[in-house]
């Protein structure tokens, strides 16, 4: 049996402990990467995929930075994952799943169109149902053999939430909550996306959010809250956290006040700009 090993610098990026391979190498060479009490100083060293890793001065509680996004949502919004079956759409390394399990979730369906991305820690967790190579757009209730989801998280790229939310409503138990990550770069028109795929204009952010909230309400979701991700995406884009509630078929959806959307956009730009200024490259 072949041992499941990967380069140290690659693992740091996979787990969200470094944004790029180059930054991972710099951290390793600087002597701030540890596994338990052992310092690791060779970027190309092959190590077990499930080895615990920490970057000194940057302790991450989850298998990837994605966990920080859900952590903020659980703190800001009146919602709990305790004892719930969740579905993690676009699970990738599993940051959302890890955060949910640490907050008492009973089970997680980790759904991703990709393969071999989920952290080994989660692969080996009996509470996690790994659904790799799965295009959520074609998911049906029959795919969920261990109970229907009562809580959902969505963190997808290169696809609009408009293709995800209509499918999700056919799977959720009435009374479920959803934390959807709104990524303006995948929702705005091409003319609104700048160089390197980054959306910087607050007006575009507000417009994307207004349209997404209207769409969600038209699909029957109640929009209960809006915030912004505490970290930017890997490409530097500001992302937003949308709290949706699914009341069940035949119920009316509900939007958020426009002034609330504008307030969150303004706060996101101010906070993340200050945070960026405080962090040396």
Swiss-Prot record:
What UniProt keywords apply to this chain's record, in alphabetical order? Methyltransferase, RNA-binding, rRNA processing, S-adenosyl-L-methionine, Transferase
Q: Which GO terms describe its molecular function?
A: methyltransferase activity; RNA binding
- EC main group: transferase
Pfam families named among the record's database cross-references: FtsJ, S4
The EC number on file is 2.1.1.-
Reading the lineage from the top rank, the first entry is Bacteria
Q: Does the keyword RNA-binding apply?
A: yes
Pinpoint the S4 RNA-binding domain residues.
Answer: 6-67
Coiled coil region boundaries: none
According to its UniProt entry, one GO biological process term is:
rRNA processing
Tell me where the signal peptide lies.
Answer: none
Which InterPro entries would you find in this protein's record?
Hemolysin_A/TlyA (IPR004538), RNA_MeTrfase_FtsJ_dom (IPR002877), S4_RNA-bd (IPR002942), S4_RNA-bd_sf (IPR036986), SAM-dependent_MTases_sf (IPR029063), TlyA (IPR047048)
> Which NCBIfam families does the UniProt record give?
tly
Belongs to which family?
Answer: Belongs to the TlyA family.
Q: What is this protein called?
A: Putative rRNA methyltransferase YqxC
């Amino acid at each position: 049996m072949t041992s499941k090993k990967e380069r140290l610098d690659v693992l740091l990026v996979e787990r969200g402990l470094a944004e790029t391979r180059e930054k991972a190498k710099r951290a390793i060479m600087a002597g701030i990467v540890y596994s338990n009490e052992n310092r690791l100083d060779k970027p190309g060293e092959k190590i077990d995929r499930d080895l615990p890793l920490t970057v000194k001065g940057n302790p991450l509680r989850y298998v990837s930075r994605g966990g920080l996004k859900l952590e903020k949502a659980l703190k800001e919004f009146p919602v709990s994952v305790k004892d719930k079956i969740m579905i993690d759409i676009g699970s990738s390394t599993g940051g959302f799943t890890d955060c949910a399990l640490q907050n008492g979730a009973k089970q997680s369906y980790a759904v991703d169109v990709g393969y071999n991305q989920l952290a080994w820690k989660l692969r080996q967790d009996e509470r996690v149902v790994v659904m790799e190579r799965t295009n959520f757009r074609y998911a049906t209730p029959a795919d969920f053999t261990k109970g229907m989801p009562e809580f959902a998280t969505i963190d997808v790229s290169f696809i609009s939430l408009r293709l995800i939310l209509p499918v999700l409503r056919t799977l959720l138990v009435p009374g479920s909550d959803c934390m959807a990550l709104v990524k303006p770069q995948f929702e705005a028109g091409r003319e609104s996306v700048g160089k390197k795929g980054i959306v910087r204009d607050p007006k575009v952010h507000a417009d994307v959010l207004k349209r997404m909230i209207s769409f969600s309400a038209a699909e029957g979701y109640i929009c209960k809250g809006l915030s912004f991700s505490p970290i930017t995406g890997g490409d530097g884009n500001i992302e937003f956290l949308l709290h949706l509630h699914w009341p069940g078929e035949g119920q009316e959806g509900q939007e958020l006040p426009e002034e609330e959307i504008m307030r969150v956009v303004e706060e996101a730009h101010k906070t993340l700009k200050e945070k960026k200024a405080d962090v040396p490259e």
